């Protein structure tokens, strides 16, 4: 991928594997290529935005923009505001969420943010229910979709996200 094609972008949203070093490498390269006012956003599921921002000379222009899966049917965008994130950067991502017909939800820059701190507990408990023989995979997912009105059960969601990603979250 020739990153130079992104030099004139106003906003770049990174969505690579949940590996801090990889994200820092990409942000460091983008920092050198992009114009100073470019906003660099990460779709990370759990990595601290402030740590990703350390790879740049523009930590005030770095923000988290966590789109939940499946993106087309999920109604929110979790915005992660690190301490150095400027009001201008935060407001731009907030407006992006509105423009995409998503409900913006702000989270502090803590591991897992809001969504995955809660979700990972649910996925782990669903796995424990199957492991302990409390219910089958189908029963656990059916109950959560029907009783909690989730679009898919926690075990189906874990498969959809990818078990390797769930492990890193």
What label would you give each PLM region?
Residues 1-39, 47-51:
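Rossmann-like NAD(P)-binding element
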Residues 12-15, 41, 93, 126, ...:
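Buried hydrophobic positions in well-ordered alpha/beta secondary-structure cores of metabolic enzymes
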Residues 80, 84, 105-169:
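Substrate-binding/catalytic subdomain of NAD(P)-dependent oxidoreductase enzymes
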Residues 39-109, 116-117:
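Rossmann-fold dinucleotide-binding core
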Residues 22, 88-99, 139-142, 146:
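A non-catalytic, amphipathic alpha-helix used as a structural packing/dimerization or gating element
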Residues 9, 23, 72-76, 122-123, ...:
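N-terminal alpha-helical segment
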Residues 8, 36-37, 59-62, 138-139:
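Short acidic capping loops at alpha-helix termini that bridge into adjacent secondary structure
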């Amino acid at each position: 991928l020739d990153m130079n094609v992104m030099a004139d972008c106003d906003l770049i949203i990174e969505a690579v594997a949940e590996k801090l070093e990889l994200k820092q490498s990409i942000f460091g390269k983008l920092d050198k290529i992009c114009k100073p006012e470019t906003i660099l956003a990460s779709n990370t599921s759990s990595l601290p935005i402030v740590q990703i921002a350390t790879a740049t000379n523009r930590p005030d222009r770095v923000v988290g923009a966590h789109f939940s899966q499946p993106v087309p049917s999920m109604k929110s965008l979790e915005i992660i505001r690190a301490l150095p994130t400027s009001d201008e950067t935060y407001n731009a991502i907030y407006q992006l969420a509105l423009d995409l017909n998503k409900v913006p939800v702000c989270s502090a820059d803590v591991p897992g943010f809001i969504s995955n701190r809660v979700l990972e507990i649910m996925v782990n408990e669903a796995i424990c229910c199957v492991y302990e023989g409390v219910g089958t995979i189908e029963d656990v997912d059916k109950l959560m979709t029907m009783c909690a009105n989730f679009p898919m059960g926690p075990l189906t969601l874990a498969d959809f996200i990818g078990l390797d990603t769930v492990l890193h979250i």
